[in-house]
């Protein structure tokens, strides 16, 4: 991921594959990039793809870290728009240009979604080969395999991550999270508590999940509240917390998490948060709030046919 880009020939290949990279006008490139990110976060994937391509077009054939970063965004937008083959082409070009562990991981996820499990697993192996000390990579691979019904085989990646040498607070945070995922709650509590004492606020989040898994609701809620009060919660974590409450039938608490996520400055999963909040309002019987949020949702995501049908249904309530 951090390897220097040295091949002029491969630069030419990537330039052709992605309509050229390298900054001609850094300011203009940054404007296109930021506009693309804004479109991506609002679910306007087609415009995001165009913006990222325009950012890449500000080039003279020279590739740098910024251009690779834009390519990752472009591939994400392509995938979310449903253009999986285009996303695959973009990841192929990145990997051909620079054997990037993150690109192998993301391409592996894409292969899994396309039903090509063998290719996905091969990419995961290459990803950890390139990034042997990246905890998040191991955890991401585990989550992806688990989501595709391969939890037992996926656990080997968590065990590999535990072998990474390091006893700093950040290491303990990741190892505590991994122990939680493996069901080793005693070790998880020990590592996460030490990480928290050394200033890792996110440890409170995983301590909450660990105690919840053990049935200690009071401690779980206490740590989750502490984490929320710290102001470092991400929209993804708030979505997960809200979804858990929604599954348990606590719609008011679910809405607290969903709306807290929507109130953050950066909300890359805004669409999922809004859809879940609408569902929580409906389940709680607050159809007026559901209608209001659904109206806002359709203004941002007008092509969602299911939401359009839901709007028609709510008008009868």
Protein language model regions, located:
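C-terminal motif of bacterial Sec signal peptides marking the signal peptidase cleavage site
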Residues: 17-20
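Helix-start (N-cap) detector for alpha-helical repeat units in TPR-like alpha-solenoids
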Residues: 29, 68-69, 101-102, 135-136, ...
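Register position in tetratricopeptide repeats
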Residues: 41-42, 80, 113-114, 144-148, ...
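Structural marker of alpha-solenoid helical repeat scaffolds
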Residues: 58, 62, 96-97, 130, ...
């Amino acid at each position: 991921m951090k390897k220097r880009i040295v091949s002029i020939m491969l630069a030419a290949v990537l330039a052709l594959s992605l309509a050229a990279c390298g900054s001609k006008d850094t300011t203009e490139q940054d404007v296109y990039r930021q506009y693309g990110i804004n479109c991506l976060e609002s679910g306007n994937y087609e415009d995001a793809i165009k913006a990222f391509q325009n950012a890449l077009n500000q080039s003279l054939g020279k590739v740098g870290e910024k251009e690779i970063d834009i390519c990752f965004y472009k591939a994400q937008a392509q995938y979310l728009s449903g253009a999986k083959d285009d996303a695959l082409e973009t990841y192929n070009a990145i990997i051909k240009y620079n054997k990037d562990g993150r690109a192998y991981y993301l391409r592996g996820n894409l292969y899994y979604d396309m039903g090509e499990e063998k290719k996905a697993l091969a990419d995961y192996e290459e990803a950890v080969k390139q990034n042997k000390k990246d905890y998040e990579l191991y955890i991401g691979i585990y989550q992806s395999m688990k989501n595709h019904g391969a939890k037992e085989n996926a656990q080997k990646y968590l065990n590999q991550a535990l072998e990474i040498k390091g006893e700093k607070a950040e290491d303990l945070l990741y190892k505590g999270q991994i122990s939680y995922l493996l069901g080793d709650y005693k070790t998880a509590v020990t590592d996460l508590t030490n990480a928290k004492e050394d200033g890792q606020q996110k440890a409170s989040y995983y301590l909450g999940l660990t105690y919840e898994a053990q049935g200690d609701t009071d401690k779980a809620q206490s740590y989750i509240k502490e984490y929320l009060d710290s102001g470092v919660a991400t929209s993804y974590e708030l979505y997960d917390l809200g979804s858990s409450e929604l599954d348990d039938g606590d719609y008011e608490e679910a809405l607290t998490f969903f709306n807290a996520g929507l109130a953050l400055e950066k909300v890359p999963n805004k669409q999922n948060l809004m859809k879940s909040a609408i569902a929580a309002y409906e389940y709680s019987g607050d159809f007026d709030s559901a209608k209001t949020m659904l109206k806002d949702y359709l203004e941002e995501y007008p092509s969602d046919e299911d939401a359009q049908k839901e709007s028609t249904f709510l008008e009868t309530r």
